C-alpha cells in the first residue's frame, strides 16, 4: 500500500505527465450508457454559479458574492483554476490579484463551461455526475429556468463525452408542506416535458432511471417519514403518475440507528430502508485519518452489512476536505468561520477515505463535490497559491498545508478512485 507521502508524489507526477493530454477533444457518438451504479465514481455537480447578465435577465452574482463583487462580499473559499478557458467565456469580477492580474470566474449558464467540466471528467475516467436540483428552486420560475438551462448543458455534455448523469433532488430550504408535492410535480415535468430520462447518457440501474432524494430525515430538513415513504414507493413502482425510478437516498449517517444527524421518529427506519440505494452524507463527520478509520468501523462496515441484508445498494460519500470561512462570515456566524477547517493534506485525506470504503466492500462511490468552492470541497482544477487570490481576501489554495501541487491534482485522485472501482466492477454479492 502506498504511504501518504508516496501517494502525493505518485499523483503529482501522474498529473504532470498527463496534463498535456487533459483537454484533447475526442468526438463521441451518443450511445446508451452502460447500466448500473456498481463500479462507478459519481461526482456531485452543483451547477449553481452565475454572473450578472449571464442569461439575459440575471442581475446578480450567484454563489461567488453575496452582493456586489468585492472582497468583503466573497462567499467562496477557493478559486477555480481557469487557465484553459478563453476570457470571453468567463466573467470579469473587477477584482485584482495581488500581482495585479484580473480575477475571473465562470457562469454555469454557459454551455462551454459545462462542456469543459465534462471533458475534464472524461480525461480522468470519472463516470459522471449527480446534478443537484434544489426543490425550492423548482417553485420559482426564474430559478427553475436557470436550473433547467444547466441540466440541458449537463445532458448535452454527458452525451458528447460518454459520461453519465442523473438528477438529485435536494430538499434543503424547502417548506415541509410543499416539498413532496414539488418533487412529484417536477419529476413529471423532467420526464414528460423535458424528457430528460430519454437521454442516452441518463444513468439507469435495475432497469430504471436513477433518481436521488437528498435530505429527507436530517434533523434540520423538511419532510415526514410517511410522506417520504409514500413518495419513494410511487417512484419505485411508477404509480400516481410518476415515471419509475431506482431511488437513491442521500441520508444522514445515523440512518441505521436513528441517531446522530438523523431524526429519531420510528417511521424513518422504514423510510430509509425503502430506498433502492443508501448514500449517507459523510462531509464534516470526521476531520483526519483516525476519524475516517472510526467512521469506517462504526458506520461504513455496519451499513454495508445492513444493506446487504436488505438486498439494497450502498454508495458511501468521500470528500477532499472542508472549509467555509467566507460563507459563514457573510452569514454572520463567526464561530463557524474557520479557514481550512478540515485540511486536505495534499490529497492524502481523500485517498484514505477511498481506500477505506473500497476495502470495506463498497463498489460505488459518491465524491462531494465536483464544483463546490463555497464549502471548499471542489475536485475540479483549483488555484495553486495564495498569490492567486483576490487582494484583500482570505482564501484557501492548493498550496495550503505546504503542498506543492498542480491545479488538476484532485481530478487525478478522483480519476484514480474511478479506475480502482472500474477494476472491481461486477455484480455485488448481496
Features from the language model and the residues they span:
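N-terminal secretory signal peptides that target proteins for export/translocation
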Residues: 1-13
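Generic low-complexity segments that are intrinsically disordered, proline-rich and/or Lys/Arg-biased
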Residues: 3-5, 21, 69, 81
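Residue-level micro-sites within transmembrane alpha helices that shape
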Residues: 12-15, 371
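Bacterial N-terminal signal peptides
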Residues: 14-27
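Bacterial Sec-dependent signal peptides at the C-terminal "C-region" and cleavage site
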Residues: 26-34
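Glycan-processing catalytic domains of CAZymes
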Residues: 33-430
Amino acid at each position: 500500500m502506498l504511504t501518504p507521502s508516496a501517494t502525493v508524489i505518485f499523483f503529482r507526477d501522474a498529473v504532470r505527465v498527463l496534463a498535456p493530454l487533459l483537454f484533447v477533444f475526442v468526438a463521441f457518438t451518443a450511445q446508451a450508457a452502460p447500466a448500473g451504479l456498481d463500479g462507478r465514481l459519481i461526482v456531485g455537480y452543483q451547477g449553481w454559479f452565475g454572473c450578472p447578465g449571464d442569461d439575459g435577465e440575471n442581475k446578480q452574482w450567484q454563489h461567488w458574492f453575496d452582493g456586489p463583487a468585492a472582497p468583503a462580499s466573497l462567499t467562496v473559499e477557493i478559486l477555480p483554476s481557469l487557465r484553459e478557458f478563453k476570457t470571453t467565456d468567463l466573467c470579469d469580477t473587477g477584482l485584482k490579484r495581488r500581482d495585479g492580474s484580473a480575477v475571473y470566474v465562470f457562469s454555469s449558464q454557459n454551455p462551454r463551461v459545462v462542456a469543459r467540466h465534462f471533458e475534464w471528467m472524461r480525461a480522468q475516467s470519472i463516470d459522471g455526475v449527480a446534478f443537484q436540483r434544489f426543490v425550492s428552486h423548482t417553485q420559482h420560475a426564474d430559478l427553475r429556468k436557470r436550473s433547467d438551462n444547466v441540466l440541458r448543458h449537463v445532458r448535452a455534455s454527458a452525451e458528447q463525452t460518454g459520461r453519465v448523469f442523473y438528477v438529485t433532488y435536494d430538499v434543503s430550504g424547502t417548506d415541509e408542506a410543499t416539498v413532496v408535492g414539488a418533487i412529484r410535480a417536477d419529476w413529471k415535468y423532467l420526464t414528460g416535458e423535458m424528457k430528460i430520462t430519454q437521454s442516452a447518457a441518463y444513468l439507469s440501474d435495475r432497469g430504471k432511471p436513477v433518481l436521488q432524494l437528498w435530505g429527507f430525515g436530517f434533523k434540520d430538513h423538511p419532510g415526514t417519514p410517511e410522506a417520504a415513504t409514500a413518495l419513494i414507493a410511487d417512484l419505485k413502482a411508477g404509480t400516481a403518475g410518476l415515471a419509475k425510478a431506482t431511488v437513491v437516498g442521500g441520508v444522514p449517517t445515523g440512518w441505521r440507528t436513528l441517531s446522530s444527524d438523523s431524526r429519531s421518529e420510528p417511521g424513518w427506519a422504514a423510510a430509509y430502508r425503502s430506498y433502492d440505494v443508501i448514500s449517507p452524507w459523510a462531509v464534516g463527520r470526521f476531520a483526519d485519518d483516525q476519524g475516517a478509520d472510526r467512521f469506517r468501523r462504526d458506520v461504513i462496515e455496519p451499513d454495508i452489512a445492513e444493506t446487504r441484508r436488505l438486498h439494497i445498494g450502498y454508495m458511501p460519500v468521500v470528500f477532499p476536505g472542508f472549509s467555509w470561512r467566507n460563507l459563514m462570515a457573510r452569514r454572520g456566524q463567526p464561530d463557524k468561520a474557520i479557514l481550512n477547517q478540515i485540511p486536505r493534506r495534499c490529497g492524502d485525506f481523500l485517498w484514505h477515505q477511498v481506500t477505506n470504503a473500497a476495502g470495506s466492500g463498497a463498489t460505488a462511490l459518491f465524491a462531494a463535490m465536483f464544483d463546490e468552492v463555497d464549502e471548499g470541497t471542489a475536485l475540479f482544477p483549483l488555484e495553486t497559491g495564495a498569490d492567486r487570490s483576490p487582494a484583500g481576501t482570505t482564501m484557501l489554495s492548493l498550496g495550503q498545508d505546504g503542498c506543492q501541487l498542480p491545479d488538476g491534482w484532485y481530478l487525478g485522485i478522483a480519476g484514480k478512485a474511478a479506475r480502482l472501482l472500474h477494476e472491481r466492477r461486477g455484480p455485488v454479492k448481496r
